[in-house]
Amino acid sequence: MQNYYEKEVLITSTYADRRCEVGIFQAGILIQDAMTEFFHQYDCDAIQMSRTHQAVWAIARTKIFMDQDILWMDRIRIKIFPVKISNVAIHLNILFESLDGHPLLRARQELCAIDSVNHTLRRIDTTPFPMDLPPMEPVLTAPCRRMKLKLGPEHQLYTHTVRTMDTDMNQHMNNTSYFRLILDTHPSSFWDTWKVQEFDIHHVNESVEGEELCQEEPGALSAQIKRGETTLIKAFLLLTPRESA
């Protein structure tokens, strides 16, 4: 049984930002698509697994490292594979590379299975995922960053009401929508000066349609999205100045 999923992608408008390059939000979409296709080949993507085993995948943590700019009309190869499989979590690595094999982006994700009815944690062996799938060598060994954020009202930048188009097939906030909210804490002039080199996000709680989110951050590097006193996500962005800035 093949222990990875691989495909080629042409970077068109769907995957490019206002600077005609793959930003963190677009990278999140590409990673999410690849993850879905990876699980689909084992008959356990979210739709199939919710129907047959009443379970869905929940992303706990994601870390993305940008090695090189990915630009409009670049053709790239995306590869996703497991690096560790435990009783309660699957650890994936994702590699974006040029067609001649140069790394462009490396990422790691930690996922768990939760019950689609009561949202309790499920053991991986209660899903169709093949537990005997041999892991591969990681391409990103740096650990996910530990974040202890306790931000108050003085750090609030804006609020956002979750609406229909923010949600996915599980009727909860789509993971990539959080990426967009974080980037929207700063105007385009800021992102014309700085780009994200490294991005960590921890998904702590879910958000559903109609709930308000408070986007907060103490500076340019850390962000927290809260609903009242409940933390939904914590994120850290390592920035680097653009050469043209």
Name every feature range the model reports, one short phrase each.
Residues 78-80, 157, 199, 215:
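Generic structural motif
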Residues 2-7, 63-149, 203-209, 218-245:
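HotDog/MaoC-like acyl-thioester-processing domains
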Residues 189-217:
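A conserved acidic, glycine/proline-rich C-terminal tail/linker
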Residues 1-59, 106-108, 114-197:
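Hot-dog-fold acyl-thioester-processing enzymes
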Residues 13-15, 66-68, 164, 200-205:
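Short, well-ordered turn and helix-capping elements at secondary-structure junctions
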